[in-house]
From Swiss-Prot:
Belongs to the protein kinase superfamily. Ser/Thr protein kinase family. It comes from Caenorhabditis elegans. GO terms for cellular component: cytoplasm; plasma membrane. GO terms for biological process: defecation; MAPK cascade; neuron projection morphogenesis; regulation of MAPK cascade; rhythmic process. ATP binds at L46, G47, K48, G49, R50, F51, G52, T53, V54, K67. This is Serine/threonine-protein kinase flr-4.
Amino acid sequence: MPINYNRNAVELKLSSQLLQWLDQRLPLGDPMRIPSIDSYKYIQDLGKGRFGTVCKFSNGNTFETVKKVDLTIFNHWTQSETKVSNRLDTFLYEFRHLHKVTNDNNRIVNFLGIYADSNQMYIMSEYLPRGSVKDLLVKETLGEDTAIKYLMETVEALDYLHNLSPPVIHRDIKAANLLITSNDSIKLANFGLVRDLAVDGFGIAIASEITLDFRATLLYVAPEVLSSALGPGNRNAYELPADIWALGCTFIEMLLKRPPHFEYFGHIDEIPKVLLGYAKSEDGKVLPYTSEVLVPSSSNCVQKIVDLVFIKSPEHRPNTHKLRIQIKKILDDDSESEEETDISHPISNSNTDSSTAISHNHSNDRKVGRAGTCLPIESMEYAAVRKELKKRSKPKSNNIMQIFVASGYYLSRILYFLNILTRSICYLLLFLSLGITALGSFLLISYFVVRFVRYLIAINCNCDLMQPQYLIISGILIVLMFALLFSCCMVALGEYKFRMANQTLDGSKFYLPRPQKSAVLCGITVITGKEDAKDTAQNMEEEIHLTPSVRRNHDDYYYDESSGPANEEN
């Protein structure tokens, strides 16, 4: 109990120390410091994220978004005061920079300031009542024209940030961080400053937690960041081209209501393992990021934009300035081709004029993946007549054959299910066997350790250790020893899992790289060598053609309050 009390005292002291540092480094005369919140009135909660709660407050005649930073994220015994202090300095430096530049550009959400006292820390920013693009996607499907408009306005915001001195890298471009103004324009929000303040320097257990928070966000991360030694959780792994890649993923999200390849993962927990595995694999396999895979039913204009953004090499990926020019050129060429099409197909009668006008209006803001052509009523009637005639001309099928087909179909499904059930039972029995064996080993080791200690005591003091009080003490020691061994094993497994997920095992002095040739034991390949892996990859297509493993309602992904609201600025 004294140990827990001391640890809790250290943890509480750290968060209190953070507020004291804030109070010292933001004096009352600082333009970034909000001296008092007496004029603020709480209205409602907007959502809750990993690093705090976002609320709506009124300040006089205006509304503001207030982020209440959850200071318990610093209450961990692995935190170092020096590291937290250094991260706080970085946080204040970047926030001051953003506080200055956001007021000079109408494409960036305004950062109004920070309030801090001895108990709490608030971050104030501009409030936009229409929410984010992600909120809009929950309610409706965006047309191509709207998605391109939002894309261009986001490019303008990034162009401004990337050309500052020093440049500002957003690092978290996605639909949830694109806020919509009252005049249907985009403002860029959520620069992840609080996340950076909390993440760096965490212990293994906390770092694993943070990595899991990036599950869905990894779908927006550029390949060079995924394959870097620092990993996607480290802010230093991001350069300017990473924002361009994330912008392309956000464009796909606006068109399809989901980021690229989201529908191919059976569960969201699979995302880090699969993406990081492909990013650092040596067999040449990559996920396809081409227009024909991501948006095959979209217009030619959208497909050109998608192929323009998703260039794997960051050196060849266009910057914001080139991207603006090339997208405008694509749009201009597309409008010219539409005009030429209209001229080459003159209107012959009023009925054609009406249908052409309707078709043109719908094509301007078409939905990707939906039919954009309306057939005349006459064509629909003729199609119905042909379908009825075709149905009548079909011969009657053999009922006995249909019974055999249906029986075989359902029997195959039953056998498949029984196969899965059998394997599940075997895995369960194997898991129980390994668990019981491991626990038995821990208990046996603990027993022999305590037995050895009792033997040493008996030799030195000639005591009768078979008395009840000594037996009770020995039993307690066995339990404590067992718990200690089990805890050490769980910590080791947690660190191993973290290093596997982040591909950092090669940093260990005990790391042994994959051999060039495969290791074969009794005719069974136990380790696949690098050469065999490359040969296998050459026999396959360079890109993976994925088949959806699960069909789900993607609106559930968008209606996730735990991921934070649209107005969350940090």
